[in-house]
Amino acid sequence: KEIILGFLKEGIKSMVFFEGRHDAHLETILELPRGWGIAYFEKTDIRKAKEVLKDHTCIMGGVPISLIVSGTPEKIDTYVKELLEDVKPGGGYILTTSVGIAPRETPLENIRALANAVEKYGKY
């Protein structure tokens, strides 16, 4: 918290990667000033994060990398559509995978399906 506040005092916003599950601790993020930066969640329920943090904090994540690696393009499309219907209203959401890089064995058609679904459903 002290580091984030120090950066913010200098006009620098932060992006914090919350590794693991933080569902039980989301309220502690509300101790930071509104608009402090971006909370990138790995395994935290992104819908719960949006419900708790609302317009206080921009949230990021929500797409399990396992879906991109082993799902089908149809499953990816449906997942993204439903996720965005739930968390897009009000803004403050960046859709991305729960980890930054897809493994080498990720099917290219699944990466395309993710990009296409974002184009189709993700515009504000």
List each model region and its residues:
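Active-site loop segments of alpha/beta catalytic cores
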Residues: 1-124
